[in-house]
């Protein structure tokens, strides 16, 4: 018990405040950029 692994001490949860704030901004941004670039090639 004297030697602890660093993986057991530092745990990286998936859903953090940083993860939510990044994906709440990045996912709609990439979706709108992809949809806008797709609209450029639509011929009427």
From Swiss-Prot:
Heme binds at residue 23. The chain crosses the membrane at residues 19-35. Pfam families: Cytochrom_B559. It is a single-pass membrane protein. With its partner (PsbE) binds heme. PSII binds additional chlorophylls, carotenoids and specific lipids. Its cofactor is heme b. Keywords: Chloroplast, Electron transport, Heme, Iron, Membrane, Metal-binding, Photosynthesis, Photosystem II, Plastid, Thylakoid, Transmembrane, Transmembrane helix, Transport. It is found in: Plastid, Chloroplast thylakoid membrane. InterPro entries: PSII_cyt_b559_bsu, PSII_cyt_b559_CS, PSII_cyt_b559_N. One of its GO terms (molecular function) is heme binding. Coiled coil: none annotated. This b-type cytochrome is tightly associated with the reaction center of photosystem II (PSII). PSII is a light-driven water:plastoquinone oxidoreductase that uses light energy to abstract electrons from H(2)O, generating O(2) and a proton gradient subsequently used for ATP formation. It consists of a core antenna complex that captures photons, and an electron transfer chain that converts photonic excitation into a charge separation. Belongs to the PsbE/PsbF family. HAMAP family: PSII_PsbF. This is Cytochrome b559 subunit beta. It comes from Chlamydomonas moewusii. The lineage of its organism: Eukaryota, Viridiplantae, Chlorophyta, core chlorophytes, Chlorophyceae.
